[in-house]
Structure formats: C-alpha cells, structure tokens
C-alpha cells in the first residue's frame, strides 16, 4: 500500500516538469533497455536453466520493466512507463481519488496481488534489499485455444492448405488452390500478366529474393538467413554455419596396448585337456565302421547309382521344348510355307486350270520362273490313285533347306498404308490437250516388217524402211506413196536430215549407208542438194589405216543415181542405226558387231569419217547427238555414257539397271533423256539430278522397242511388242527446283501382231501433235 501511494505521489510531483525531463528520461530508458537486452542475450547471466519459470532481474532505475518469456526461454522487454504514460496514470489517479471508496478497494486488491506474486517469486535477499525487483512473467495460456496452436516445432508447421503432397498443377484450371482446415476453398491470389511481372521486376528491389509458395500461391520474401543457407548449399558446404566440420578427434578406444588388461582371467584346465564327449563320439564311429553299419561317401554314391539304373536321354530336344539359342540373340523363326490352295488339288475346279493363253505365258517365263504366279501347272485327275509321283519334290525340299539356312531373316513392321495415298495426284488428261487420241490414217504398201520411219523437217513428207528391201516416200496429208527406192538388202534404219536447207535421207541397208536425194518438195532445194553431193572435196588430212579399213566413201553408180542415191558409205559390218546432228552436217552410225569401231561419226561436207573410241566398253546399241551441247550419247546393253566431243573425255555414266537397252530419245532442251528397254520398262533420266533414273515407267506388257520426244509439245510416245503406242505428257519446267511432270495420257492399240513383234518404231510430226508408228503388220499408222 505504501509502495503504490509513493508511486502515485511521485507521478503527481513529476506532472509540471514532464516536458522538461522527457528527453533525459528517454535517453536513460534506452540505455536501460539495451543493458537489459544484453543481459537476456548473455546465457551466462541466466538465473535458472528451467524453461517456463518466472525469473527476476534487478535494476537501479525506479521505472518498472516487464519481460515476457516464450516456451523456449527467450525474453522480450516491454517498458512499463514513459513520460506520456505517467501523465495518463497521474490523471487517472486524480479521477480515482475523486471517486472515493471505489479507488481504495482497487488499491487493496492490487496490494494483495503484488503480495501473492512476491511470495511465489522468492527473489534473492541481497538483490531485493538494495534494488527494486523487476519481474518477468510468462503469459498464461488461454484455455479456449488449442494446445499446439503457437508451437514452433517443425512437426507442427502452420500448413493452411491440406491437399497433401500432390502436384499443384492439378489446380491450374480452378479458381482455388486447395482447402484449409475448415474444408473451405483457398482462393488463388490475383495473378498479374507479363506487364505486371515486368513492372515488379523493375520497381521491386526484393524481386530477386521473392519466390512463390506452391501451396498457397503467395509470394514469399527470402530472408538474409535463407539466402545465406541457399548459398552454402549451392557451394557444397554444410548448411549449418555453426557446425564445426573439423572437430578434434577423441580416441574413445585407444590403439595403445595398456599394461593392465581389462580381462585377466586364467584359462580353465578343460581348455587344454582332450574332450571326453569327442572321445566317446569317435569310439562310436570306429565301432560302426567295424560292424559295417557306417559307410563312406563313395559307397553311398555307388549304392544310389545301382538303384537308379542306366540313364537314357534324347539326342535332340523335342519339338515342344524351346531350343536354347546360344550365340544368337532374339532369333527369328523361319517363315511357314503357304497352305495349298484349290489349284494344287488333284481334281481342281475348271476355272483353276490353264487355258492355251495362260499355258503359253507360263512357258514363256521359263528363264524367269520367279515371275510366274504359280510355280507349277495345275492338272486334273479322275481319282487320287491316278496321281503320279511328284518329280520336283526333292528339288523343292532342297531349295527349302537352302532358304532356311542361307537366307537372312529380319523382322519388319508391317505398314498399313492406304492404296489411294500411294497414287500420285495427277492432272486430268482433258487439261493436257492437245495430244493424239484416234487413228487417222494407215499407210499401206510394204510387204514385210516396217522397221523405221522419219519425217521431213517441214512436216510434208514421210520416209519408211522395211524388210522388203524398199524405201518408200509418202505424202502425209494424202497417204500417197510418191517414190519407192529398192535396195539390195534389208533396210534397218532411215533418217531425214534435220536441216531444212537440205533434202537428204540417210538409209542404212546392210553394210552400206546411202545418202539419197528424195527429189520431193522445192526444186531449188533439190538442185542445191545435188550440187552439194556431186563432187567430193579435196582431202586435207591423211586418213589412218584403221579408218580406211572400217569405212569407205564413194559416189553412187549410174543405176543408183537414177533412184536418187548420191553417196555410198561402205562399212565393214552391218549397220543397225543412223542418226543426224542437229545442224545436218554430221551423222553417226552404229555397228554392234564392230567391237571398238562400233560407232562412227561422218562429216558430210568434207566426206571424212572418225572413230571416236579406241577401246570397247561393251556392245553399243544406240547413239545420239546432244541438241545444244557438243556431247555424244552412247548406249550399251546396260549403261549409257555421255562424252564431251571437244574435250574428248567421259562426262557422265548413267546406270539403267536394265538387261538390254533398245533405244533413246533426248528432250529438245537437252536436260532429260528417255530410254526404252527390252525388259518392258521406260526410264526417265534427269541429267542435272542424278545418274540413276528419275522415274521408271512400266506401262507396257512386252518389250519396248522405241521412244520419241516431240520437238515443240510436252509429249512423248513409246511403242512396244504388245501392239500399243502409249502417248504421255512430259512437262519439263524452267525452274530447276521443280521436278518434271509425267502423266500417261492415251493408249493407242491398232497394230496387229506378227511373229511376236508389234510396234517397231515411233516418230512425231515436227509441227503438229501427231505421232507415226510402224509395225510388224507392214503398215504405218498416223494418230492425231
């Protein structure tokens, strides 16, 4: 009571001087607070080690300070009075004095409480006598709150989101991010766009240390301690900086031998005496051996072997057991034979038996049995007992064994591809007109095979050569035969000079090449041609013996002069093909039997011949001149070689992958080549692209004899032994990045078949989209 009243009087006395002393009291309070906090932080000055027990601190100041302690013993200082608070307390006490008895009762209650606290705290006698005691009281726990609400332990973390350890991206499509302890949705915080994030990155200085909590979606700012911890972990150091990594080693068990052993008990007497139990066991075993009761291991094995008897095993494993494949990983089983069909029956239905045509085709593929649909010819018997022994049984078994152990096996994934997807999307033929569609005229007059045909450069006349040893000149518009020139041998090839200023036809008959003036067309042109071929020019160069023995130039005799023959070039072997250069001064001939002199080049103006090759690269079948460049195309049976006539070197070798080449035709621009083969194929070569075929066309059923490009229109035609002439669209673009467009247009099949031969030669009209074809039926047909 006295202490409380003294405090009140002191407050009243200090009222007039509050403003004057405020600054001095504030400085003194700050010094006292720092001293008290330093005393709290220093563990050596703690009055007790027990947590949760009220502790007392002493101070010389008359002001009262209270400290609150948490469960871990950390204290927080709280000032109880200041200059402003003292004014408020003094004013409150004056009001209380005016109230009277009510204030006195409250004072008495406060004295009782202070006495009870003093009796519980029990401060030290020496400190309490000299200084005023300052008590630090622990706050009482509210019974209405949970016991572990304010806990700081890691096991009781304040986790508001109760979804558990799940991927949080499951809540990306929802407005909430989980549920709290009351099963209420935790709404996601507002998310800014990229502009907001950019502004925060610029304006917020703590943006670099801000992370997002995936459980709550809130931005959490990392403290300096967290950043220091992260740096230590990243650098590979121990996270706790207070941990001493290199503490002094304490040898709990020393390596030095001590003088006094821990255990020094002397050995027992039985440790060095023979064991009595072992002695008894050995004596029993000796007695059993003497009596024959006990047997050795070898005797036991011999008795077991006698009981088992002889052991039999199979030389090979059974078919049901899986063979252990050594040295082979992931073995592939052999493919099974196809089950027999109705055609293999001894009495098959009539529709499975071959007719005369099918039998002929089956026998025709004798050299290529793998192309047959059936490897046998179905037969019909009345009964099973009439079926003879199968003569090819051993051969088929032998081939099957060869396939099983010689052919490599591999697993392939079967692709289910729609057939329509593989068919290229081609334009409609109606959009690609004009092209020949019907047969317009038939030129009849030859009595044997018509092997070759050629058209005048202006497109008015037509020349043909036949096996009936005649050369006929036709008028295209009327179909009238204007002139017939008889020869001594079969006419293999005819070629009209492409130069419109000359009227010359080259005729290959036997060993001779005849240069004929057809005497049709302009008379001035005919006379100019006769003047050119009348006299031989002087020879400036001496020809070698190799050329003289291969070819000889001479003027035609009188009887041949009347027929129109002007010059005769005699070769040492039969001529198969003749072709002109684009300018009309050079022409080349092919003699397949001539070995390294199979191809010859003749110059008309100088009446001189050349042998371009000194070595034989194979049997030459066909030659061509490039329409623009000084290049020479030479086709052997399997390959095509392109030579530069100026540099006299090989430029390129085209690989046809065919058995036998029959003919060639080059595009007017000179960048694409069309090749026909006897194995039913046509090959399109893009000379700028590759040495392999750009496209292989199998449009015919039999051997393809001839192919030809049109000079003006994007058309080409092919003739085959299946009596068909197929007209196709072949557009070559100026853009090198765009591939040629090839579209089959029309199949013209009007020729008749004679002795397995059909169409022998095709040629285009130089101006109109018309095509001429010669056949084994001794006719020439025009399609327009």
Curated annotation (Swiss-Prot):
Statement: the UniProt record of this protein carries the keyword Nucleus: yes
Broad class of where this protein is predominantly found: nucleus
Start-end of Basic and acidic residues biased regions: 112-123, 138-148
PROSITE patterns in UniProt: WD_REPEATS_1 (PS00678), WD_REPEATS_2 (PS50082), WD_REPEATS_REGION (PS50294)
Positions with biased composition (Basic residues): 1-11
Compositionally biased residues, Acidic residues: 27-36, 45-54, 62-73, 84-111, 149-158
GO biological process assignments: maturation of 5.8S rRNA from tricistronic rRNA transcript (SSU-rRNA, 5.8S rRNA, LSU-rRNA); maturation of LSU-rRNA from tricistronic rRNA transcript (SSU-rRNA, 5.8S rRNA, LSU-rRNA); regulation of hemocyte proliferation
Keyword presence, Hydrolase: no
One example GO MF annotation: ribonucleoprotein complex binding
Family: Belongs to the WD repeat BOP1/ERB1 family.
Protein name: Ribosome biogenesis protein BOP1 homolog
